[in-house]
């Protein structure tokens, strides 16, 4: 069992205030390959990127399934603080984070010190965990994030390219390299995590898998198949995920719950089926969703018979299917009305994932969640004469984040442009305008 360090209400308020301050700062530093615990990102963003890389055009067929041993329990405190100090100069903030890390946990009524790890259950813990592994993201980007020309050059030389997709402490590395190159990359990842971040990869769970054999990530099983003479990548729920939701349904339809009203019970089951189906609505085969719906329905019918001691005559008149608004539904007519279990055969399949918002975000880049959309016309705020808005520094500190051309601009270049604008008083040196400022070379180069 993992020790949980759930803070009291007062500490949670302080942690949330601290998170609200630090999150916009580190959102600028976080790399595009990170998807977990970030505003505006979700598991399907990572899945969409993986699906686009494993097609017949990209051919990233080898996958390194990364598994860090007890990540949240083994984060090195002093290493984490050294990373935080690169961006946080306020000593009081650093001291406060240190106290949160050293708060300890209660196990069986006894206090236990926390020498390593971030307290699971804390409001700020996901952010700190992301800050720590952002060093891994930057290392991967430095080594593997190449221009299209550099990638093509490596392919012509018989070498492969690599892409990292990370969600919290779960990550996969996809490659179009040969097996020997992939093995070497796995060793390099292991060495970096051990030497730089004091983390251990699980040898049993960190595997090298070919896409034809399939792998699990974020509750999905991704596998390349040839069902109709053409290679396609299938996206399906994992067997473990299906068994988990079936276990919940079994518990809710057991004999111990027969005292509950029929309508309330089916409302609860509908919520479970709907939530599960919504998460897996982009799967390749809807048979998986139909399987869960059918399982839920017949478990519910069995529960009704248990509730009324098998007397179908007085309780269950008939069970049938009908179509309402192009949705197939199972309906049981019970006493004074009908009870309906929603089925989700109408949900879009994996083919629609290509046109979904997830793929669009992957192609066009992610908008910085704390900056206005570049296409929106947000009117400027009015401030008293001589004062500037409280978010002025935040906006200028993330120069380039709102333009498509420079959204992936290195942090060093953004900071250089910020210093130039500060030097010139946030005014254009030619016309004196203070709007839509852009930093350029004093003397134009061939590329500008």
Each language-model region and where it sits:
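Non-catalytic terminal/accessory segments
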Residues: 1-426, 435
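Histidine-centered nuclease catalytic patch
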Residues: 404, 429-448
């Amino acid at each position: 069992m993992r020790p949980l360090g759930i803070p009291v209400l007062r500490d949670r308020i302080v942690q949330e205030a601290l998170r609200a301050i630090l999150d916009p700062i580190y959102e600028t530093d976080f790399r595009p390959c990170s998807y977990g615990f970030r505003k505006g990102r979700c598991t399907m963003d990572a899945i969409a990127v993986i699906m686009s890389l494993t097609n017949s055009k990209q051919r990233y067929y080898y996958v390194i399934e990364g598994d860090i041993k007890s990540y949240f329990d083994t984060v090195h405190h002093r290493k984490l603080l050294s990373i935080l100090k690169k961006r946080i100069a306020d000593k009081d903030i650093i001291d406060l984070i240190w106290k949160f890390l050293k708060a300890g946990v209660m196990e069986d009524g006894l206090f236990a010190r926390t020498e390593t790890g971030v307290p699971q259950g804390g409001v700020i813990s996901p952010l700190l965990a992301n800050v720590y592994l952002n060093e891994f993201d930057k290392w991967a980007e430095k080594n593997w994030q190449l221009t299209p020309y550099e990638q093509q050059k490596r392919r012509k030389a018989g070498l492969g390219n690599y892409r990292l997709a990370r969600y919290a402490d779960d990550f996969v590395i996809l490659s179009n390299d040969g097996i020997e190159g992939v093995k070497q990359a796995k060793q390099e990842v292991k060495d970096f995590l051990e030497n730089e971040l004091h983390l251990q990869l699980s040898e049993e769970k960190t595997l090298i898998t070919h896409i034809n054999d399939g792998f699990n990530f974020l509750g999905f099983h991704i596998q390349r198949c040839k069902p109709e003479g053409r290679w396609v990548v299938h996206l399906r729920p994992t067997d473990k995920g299906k068994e988990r939701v079936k276990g919940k349904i079994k518990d809710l339809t057991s004999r111990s719950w027969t005292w509950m009203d029929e309508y309330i019970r089916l409302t609860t089951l509908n919520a479970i089926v709907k939530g599960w189906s919504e998460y897996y609505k982009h799967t390749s085969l809807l048979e998986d969703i139909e399987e869960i719906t059918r399982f839920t329905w017949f478990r519910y019918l069995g529960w009704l018979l248990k509730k009324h001691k098998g007397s179908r005559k007085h309780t269950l008149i008939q069970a049938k299917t009908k179509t309402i608004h192009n949705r197939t539904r199972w309906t049981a007519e019970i006493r004074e009305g009908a009870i309906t279990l929603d089925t989700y055969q109408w949900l879009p399949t994996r083919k629609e994932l290509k046109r979904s918002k997830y793929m669009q975000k992957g192609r066009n880049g992610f908008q910085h969640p704390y900056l206005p959309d570049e296409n929106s016309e947000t009117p400027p705020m009015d401030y008293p004469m001589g004062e500037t808005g409280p978010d002025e520094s935040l906006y200028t500190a993330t120069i380039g984040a709102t333009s498509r051309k420079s959204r992936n601009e290195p942090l060093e270049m953004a900071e250089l442009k910020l210093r130039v604008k500060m030097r010139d008083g946030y005014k254009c040196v030619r016309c004196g305008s203070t709007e839509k400022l852009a930093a350029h070379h004093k003397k134009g180069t061939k590329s500008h």
